[in-house]
Amino acid sequence: MFNEICIYEAKIEKQEEIEQLMREVAEFYLTQPGVIEVKYIKRTHRQKDFNSVKAGEPPLRLTRQVEKVTYVLYLVVENEEAHARLAKPGLEMFYKRWTRCLTTMPKIILGENIV
């Protein structure tokens, strides 16, 4: 398995647009050969502090967004070749729409499974 984790910081006023775009991208990805799983996650909670984690307290729901909204892509494909085949058409189809919604370029982590 080969994984991509991508962290996006979106403009607050573009939340609806980027979430619709994520649904379209996920739908496209799932039709492509070698794609196993696609998930987009919106950051909605945070930990109070480390002591609250040790005490087993639940995370706190975010009540407001300041300047940006954080999203994460979790993508699993069969191998590096499947990822390469997916990246090119994905960028060609969606890149301009992504850039309109983001405050900065995404942080991308690529790698293989350990467990």
Question: Language-model features: where?
Answer:
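Short, flexible helix/strand-to-coil boundary loops that buttress conserved ligand/catalytic motifs
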Residues: 22, 86-87, 95-98
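Short, flexible turn/loop "capping" segments at secondary-structure junctions
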Residues: 1-2, 65-68
